[in-house]
A protein has these predicted regions:
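Ligand-binding loop in jelly-roll beta-barrel domains
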Residues: 82-105
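Structural motif
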Residues: 60-62, 69, 85, 95
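Conserved short histidine dyad/triad with adjacent acidic residue
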Residues: 33-48, 82
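Short, conserved beta-strand element in jelly-roll/cupin
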Residues: 36-38, 48-63
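A short, N-terminal "cap"/entry segment at the start of jelly-roll beta-barrel domains
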Residues: 1-29, 33, 78
Length: 105
């Protein structure tokens, strides 16, 4: 077994969402998911039992955290603590791409 793992985005397993999500890495302690949301697409408000760091690599969108809506621009990261409600919405004209890092420990 190797001391490393390589995963190409186009070969990564899909997550079960209504938009394109790919699992780039997953372990008991950490998971990395790449999300792509088309213009107008949004995810439902939800919570997770672990901290999550989002990195918006392309586009801009609305990140709802609790009762607050934040306009997030590309090349920005946001950490949301475990148990806090969150959701993304693409309110722009182009696709947004988000790297989701789940800190499960």
């Amino acid at each position: 077994m190797n001391d490393y793992q390589i995963m190409r985005l186009d070969a990564a397993p899909r997550v079960l969402f209504k938009f394109d999500g790919r699992i780039l890495f997953s372990s008991d302690r950490f998971e990395m998911v790449h999300l792509s949301l088309d213009p107008g697409a949004s995810m439902e408000l939800h919570t997770q039992p672990f901290d999550v760091v989002f990195y918006l690599s392309e586009g801009s969108g609305i990140l709802t955290i609790g009762l607050e809506e934040l306009e997030i621009q590309s090349e920005t990261s946001v950490m949301v603590q475990a148990g806090v409600t969150r959701a993304w919405k693409n309110n722009g004209k182009g696709m947004i791409k988000i790297l989701v890092c789940k800190l499960k420990e």
